[in-house]
């Protein structure tokens, strides 16, 4: 049976996790990467509905589902990921030719991580509007994620944040682990993020050459 890669995407409330998924999915599909999406919310499936609306005509609605966890966001993806595991297994059984499942956690804090029983790869998303001190606050999401995404770069001048400081501190906290600046409104960094994901997590998936 084909091994389907599972990628967890976590980060604080409002950091742009859903927007990142909505931005990278069309580019992944253009490369021939087959995608499923699972979102997590505590008491609704609002993120899933938002993704379905945004990606209408790009990804069929049945390949995007929401999990209503009813619990603390990190519990549902770390301590007891049973609801997400059930959702993943159901989706993979219905779409066995899939290459990757993107699993978005509910908004949480800098301590968020995913259970290795649930995901193979972990992307952590922070945003510039939270302040340029966030990378040096550290935490598992900052230092241990496979890729750190620093989103909403366009907001830096409005909140007095320095991208140079965030770049410096991210290098210090992460060592050789990659991080990338993105802006989902303009597309800045999104193609680079997609290729980074492919090279690190989906390297065995053939991709289409750019025409």
Curated annotation (Swiss-Prot):
GO terms for molecular function: GTP binding; GTPase activity; nickel cation binding. Disulfide bonds: none annotated. SUPFAM superfamilies: P-loop containing nucleoside triphosphate hydrolases. It comes from the Bacteria. Pfam families: cobW. GO terms for biological process: urea catabolic process. Keywords: Chaperone, Cytoplasm, GTP-binding, Nickel insertion, Nucleotide-binding. It is found in: Cytoplasm. InterPro entries: CobW/HypB/UreG_nucleotide-bd, P-loop_NTPase, UreG. One of its GO terms (cellular component) is cytoplasm. GTP binds at residues 11-18. The keyword Membrane does not apply. Facilitates the functional incorporation of the urease nickel metallocenter. This process requires GTP hydrolysis, probably effectuated by UreG. Belongs to the SIMIBI class G3E GTPase family. UreG subfamily. Homodimer. UreD, UreF and UreG form a complex that acts as a GTP-hydrolysis-dependent molecular chaperone, activating the urease apoprotein by helping to assemble the nickel containing metallocenter of UreC. The UreE protein probably delivers the nickel. This is Urease accessory protein UreG. It comes from Laribacter hongkongensis (strain HLHK9). The lineage of its organism: Bacteria, Pseudomonadati, Pseudomonadota, Betaproteobacteria, Neisseriales. The gene is ureG.
